């Protein structure tokens, strides 16, 4: 277990001015952060099932990348018994465990120095459709993670979750209008103003706007559940051939845009389609295990926003969610075709999906820089 160091210094400049930019996920990583799941009104059996799943995810990542886990003080002893010994437990208070969305975006410069962007956070919508209240502890998570690494911090004037952006490391940012232009995030900002801020804080210049995310995604359609970059000029898109499925028009609209756009380097995109699992639904037993609280209620029969695109690229591994025995092997084979140079590792991840996300959502990489 590690204690906090001196608080991260807040900078008054912007990453693009200072020559810092967000690297692609396939850039070398020095660490991956996760957060302990415990919310009884989001995780069944007060998080017991999710905790066991998070331990398996941490193990899959830890074989190639050091794993840090933020844990509230009251749960440190419990986390020590559940988590693999290689995981570094850090005392960090949080309202829930979505490291992708509450953690920092680490940016690097040509010298290999790292700094962090600390975005505003309002629990995916605040008082207008947010997923729980309060979220005050979550707002401090990024700063505490940056302090752990001794990185200076940029405070961005934008409500933004890490799961709502993907970059290729070469000037392109991909996102969804459903989330970033939602009235419950930054209602006072236009699309052009949001692009200007992302350009300043990620150091990107080209934006690919997909209309909508995955059907029933309670984050308002995060890009990381729908589509991601595989390498420069190539993307992986969540897909169904079933035209009667509510997901079909969403994926088709995304495909039409991706096939008719270029990235920041002027390349046309190669689009790899990865089939959706299921459809998957919450069971009565799963719904009953979730306590009542300020979180969004879990309902039996509710469709789950399962997606194999919600994987993590970490050093020489792809860690992806196993969600459906009918399609898991197809997804693994497809990922191996897309990423021949990577080891493809699946982790049973239904418990994460029941809480509203998946492997990419519960992880946040820290690039090596050097």
From Swiss-Prot:
Disordered as annotated region, ranges: 1-20
Enzyme class: hydrolase
Composition bias type Polar residues, residue spans: 1-19
Enzyme active site: 361 (amidino-cysteine intermediate)
Leader sequence residues: none
Pfam family of the protein (one): PAD_porph
GO MF term list: agmatine deiminase activity; protein-arginine deiminase activity
GO aspect biological process, one term: putrescine biosynthetic process
Catalytic activity from the UniProt record: agmatine + H2O = N-carbamoylputrescine + NH4(+)
InterPro entries xref list: Agmatine_deiminase, Peptidyl-Arg-deiminase_porph
Annotated keywords: Hydrolase
EC number: 3.5.3.12
NCBIfam families membership: agmatine_aguA, PRK13551.1
Family per record: Belongs to the agmatine deiminase family.
Protein name per UniProt: Putative agmatine deiminase
Species name: Shewanella frigidimarina (strain NCIMB 400)
């Amino acid at each position: 277990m590690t204690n906090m160091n001196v608080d991260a210094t807040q900078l008054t400049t912007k990453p693009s001015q200072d020559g810092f930019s967000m690297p692609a996920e396939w850039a070398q990583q020095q660490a991956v952060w996760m957060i302990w799941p415990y919310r009884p009104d989001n995780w069944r059996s007060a998080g017991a099932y999710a905790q066991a799943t998070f331990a398996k995810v941490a193990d899959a990542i830890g074989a190639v990348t050091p794993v840090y886990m933020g844990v509230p003080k009251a749960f440190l002893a419990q986390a020590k018994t559940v988590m693999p010994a290689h995981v570094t437990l850090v005392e960090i208070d949080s309202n829930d465990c979505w490291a992708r969305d509450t953690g920092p975006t680490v940016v690097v410069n040509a010298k290999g120095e790292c700094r962090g962007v600390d975005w505003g956070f309002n629990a995916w919508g605040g008082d207008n459709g947010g997923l729980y209240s309060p979220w005050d502890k979550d707002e401090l998570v990024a700063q505490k993670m940056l302090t752990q690494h001794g990185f200076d911090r940029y405070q961005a004037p934008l409500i933004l979750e890490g799961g709502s952006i993907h970059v290729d490391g070469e000037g392109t940012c991909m996102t969804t209008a459903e989330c970033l232009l939602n009235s419950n995030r930054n209602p006072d900002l236009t699309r052009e103003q949001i692009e200007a801020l992302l350009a300043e804080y990620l150091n990107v210049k080209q934006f690919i706007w997909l209309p909508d995310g995955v059907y029933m995604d309670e984050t308002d359609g995060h890009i990381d559940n729908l589509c991601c970059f595989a390498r420069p000029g190539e993307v992986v898109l969540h897909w169904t051939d079933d035209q009667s499925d509510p997901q079909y028009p969403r994926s088709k609209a995304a495909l039409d845009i991706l096939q008719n756009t270029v990235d920041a380097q002027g390349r046309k995109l190669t689009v790899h389609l990865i089939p959706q699992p299921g459809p998957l639904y919450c069971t009565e037993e799963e719904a009953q295990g979730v306590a009542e609280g300020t979180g969004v209620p879990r309902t039996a029969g509710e469709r789950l926003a399962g997606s194999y695109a919600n994987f993590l690229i970490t050093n020489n591994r792809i860690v992806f969610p196993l969600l459906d025995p009918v399609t898991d092997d197809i997804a693994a084979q497809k990922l191996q075709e897309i990423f021949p140079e990577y080891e493809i590792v699946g982790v049973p991840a239904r418990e994460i999906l029941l809480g509203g996300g998946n492997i990419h959502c519960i992880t946040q990489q820290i690039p090596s820089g050097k």
